[in-house]
A protein has these predicted regions:
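Partner-binding and oligomerization surfaces adjacent to conserved cores of proteins
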Residues: 1-167
Length: 167
């Protein structure tokens, strides 16, 4: 699937030169309700959710859009229309669709009984759930393991393998 990464020109050029892209940590994403797409009133779910939140610290997110020509995306992520938009081909099996909801999801099952706790699939679903107000982003995500920090203090992943820069 062809997906697009909006960024400032200086970061785009650095990405191209170094053949890598920055991985965002959950706590650094711009939506203050990120990873809070669920109603935590159920105690067993809340406990499982906390465990999943800890597991989420082992991986990061790279956010892409399916659209390269969205004026709001250029304004918000493309350095106020002065940046660049990089187009990548990424195999569909590595892409996670973001689902948008008008309110927090309420779990209707006992997580422990039905799933044996918070499964990897449930954690991924939580990581790919956003409030409906963000729907204009038409976002997809790639979830990657966090390895060693760059000397700058950030995490990066190479373009090689599952991600090919095309435009």
């Amino acid at each position: 699937m062809r997906v697009y990464y909006y960024t400032a020109e200086e970061f785009a050029l650095s990405n191209i030169i170094n053949e890598r892209i920055k991985i965002s940590l959950i706590d650094d994403l711009n939506d203050p309700f990120e990873f809070l797409g669920v109603d935590l009133s159920n105690k067993s779910f809340r406990q499982a959710f906390k465990a999943g939140r800890c597991r989420s610290k082992e991986c990061g997110i790279i956010s892409f859009s399916k659209d390269w020509n969205n004026p709001l995306m250029w304004a918000h992520y493309g350095d106020k229309h002065k940046g660049m938009c990089l187009g990548f081909d990424i195999h569909d099996s590595h892409i996670k669709e973001v689902t948008y909801f008008p309110e927090r999801m309420a779990p209707e099952v006992d997580m422990e009984k039905k799933y044996g706790g918070l499964t990897e699939d449930i954690v991924v679903n939580l990581m790919c759930t956003k409030y409906i107000g963000w729907k204009y982003e038409n976002e997809v995500r790639v979830i990657v393991p966090l390895e060693e920090k760059d000397p700058s203090g950030f995490y990066f992943t190479d373009f090689k393998g599952n991600m090919e820069l095309q435009e």
